[in-house]
């Protein structure tokens, strides 16, 4: 019995030793795996950091610049494209930068802007990020002057015989019109001119190629392909000049001065409309007077803000009001400019062939 107990004790001790050794072996193996896993995590982290360093972050100021740049960077590896404003913002007349906007700009390698003063917040950007590489798309474009469309056109009609108080009111309204979209002395809406927009695309491509020489050939190839499509639009415009050359028109948006210029039309009167102003009775009389005095048969208006005024003057006259897309808002579709401008061209063609 004594020997049996001794044997059981020895067996228990052996089992205990084996279990202890097994636990030690398991912990050693797990430790090795953990070390290997930690090394792998560190390697992945370093890899992710390297990949982040290889990303070129391009931020655009608003919709027209986004669409132009989207065509240039399309398919280029390692490019992140962001737009500062919402796609439905439209022109950046009174756009205020938010903390989120400033945070986005802090990540940017390149900031593509229209230029011409339309981005009124640029002094704040320059102050916050003095080393940010800014591409001004309009830098090689001949901008129109605000005086190229006659917003102070004088006509001899009933409005001139109004009382002094009404006359003063009209001048105040005209001052409102002149200052509503004030970008300085230049008309910054150059993307509405197809040949100027083509130049802007080339400028953006050249500057991106300088910044990211590794992908320069891709930027230039994309710009060339996009330019070929834009050239077709310009050819269509030129083919219609036999109808439009020298025609007097009225425009209800400053951007349409560029449309008039492309078609060799004379914008004899500008009434710049937006959501911030109402039209006075005196202004309506002036527009009707301009239609009669200058033989205007077509008005270019924006559907969003010019619908009521367009209806008013078309009811009083035989003028044809067409609603042109200012191409400053829309979907993030790289062909949206092509579609929008094609539609504008067709509307103008129809207006002058009726």
Briefly describe each language-model feature range.
Residues 2-354:
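Extracytoplasmic metal-acquisition and chelation regions
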């Amino acid at each position: 019995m004594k020997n049996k107990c001794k044997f059981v004790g020895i067996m228990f001790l052996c089992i205990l030793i084996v279990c202890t050794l097994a636990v030690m072996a398991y912990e050693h193996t797990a430790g090795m795996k953990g070390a290997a896993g930690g090394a792998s995590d560190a390697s992945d982290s370093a890899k992710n950091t390297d990949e982040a360093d290889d990303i070129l972050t391009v931020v655009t100021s608003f919709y027209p610049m986004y669409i132009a740049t989207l065509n240039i960077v399309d398919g280029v590896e390692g490019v992140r494209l962001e737009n500062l404003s919402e796609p439905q913002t439209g022109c950046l007349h009174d756009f205020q930068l938010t903390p989120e906007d400033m945070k986005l700009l802090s990540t940017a390698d390149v900031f593509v802007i229209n230029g011409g003063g339309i981005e009124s917040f640029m002094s704040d950007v320059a102050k916050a990020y003095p080393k940010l590489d800014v591409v001004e798309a309009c830098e090689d474009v001949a901008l129109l002057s605000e005086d190229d469309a006659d917003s102070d056109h004088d006509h001899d009609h009933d409005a001139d015989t109004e009382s002094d108080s009404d006359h003063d009111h009209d001048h105040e309204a005209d001052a409102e019109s002149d200052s509503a979209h004030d970008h300085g002395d230049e008309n910054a809406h150059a993307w509405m001119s197809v040949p100027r927009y083509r130049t802007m695309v080339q400028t953006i491509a050249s500057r991106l190629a300088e910044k990211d020489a590794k992908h320069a050939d891709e930027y230039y190839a994309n710009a060339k392909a996009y330019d070929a499509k834009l050239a077709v639009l310009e050819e269509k415009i030129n083919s219609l000049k036999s109808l439009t050359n020298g025609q007097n028109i009225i425009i209800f948006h400053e951007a349409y001065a560029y449309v008039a210029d492309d078609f060799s039309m004379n914008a004899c009167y500008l009434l710049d409309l937006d959501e911030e102003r109402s039209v006075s009775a005196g202004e309506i009389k002036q527009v009707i007077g301009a239609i009669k005095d200058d033989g205007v048969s077509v008005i270019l208006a924006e559907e969003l803000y010019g619908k009521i005024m367009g209806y008013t003057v078309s009811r009083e006259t035989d003028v044809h009001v067409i609603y042109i897309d200012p191409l400053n808002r829309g979907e993030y579709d790289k062909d949206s400019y092509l579609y929008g401008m094609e539609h504008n061209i067709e509307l103008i063609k129809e207006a002058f062939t009726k």
